[in-house]
Amino acid sequence: MEKTALYPGSFDPVTKGHIDIIRRSVALFDRVIIGIFKNSSKNRAWFSDEEKCQMIQEILEKENIKAEIKVFNGLLVDFIKEEKVDILVRGLRALSDYEYELQFTLTNKTLAKSDFETIFLSASREYLYLSSSLVKEIAQNQGDLKMFVPKNVEERMIEKVKQMRI
C-alpha cells in the first residue's frame, strides 16, 4: 500500500536543513508532498508562495529529488484529508522544537477526522541550529549564506537584501 507523506512549512526561505528532511522523507515514503503554507501576512514573508515553489522546484530538479510541491491555506488537517496523507513529517532540532511539535501534533489529531501519523525526523547534526529566521538575520547583515542555503536561494536572498536597502 502506497504511503503518502506531507512535509509542511513556510519555507521562507528553504534551507539546507529543510532539503535534508525532504531528501530523507523521499527515501522513506512512496509519495512526498512539500506543503507550503499560503502566506496570510505577506508583509512579513521575504518570498511569495510562487518564489518559494520556484526555488524548491529548482533544488528538487538539480538534486534529482522526487517530491511534489503544493501551496495550501486553511487548516493543515483539511489539506491532509484532501491529499489523502498517511504521514505528517516534522523536523526536530532541539527539545524546544519537540514541545512545540507535540502540541501541534495533538491539536491536529484532535481536529482530524482521518487517521494519519506524525513522524519526527531529527535534524542532521550539521543543521541542528539552523532556522529560516537565523538565515534571514545573516543575510540582512551581509554574512556568508553558503553553508545554510542552496545557491539559488542564496542568490535570491542577496537580491532581496539589496531591494530592502533601496
What are the residue ranges of the model-derived segments?
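Nucleotidyltransferase catalytic core that binds NTPs
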Residues: 1-166
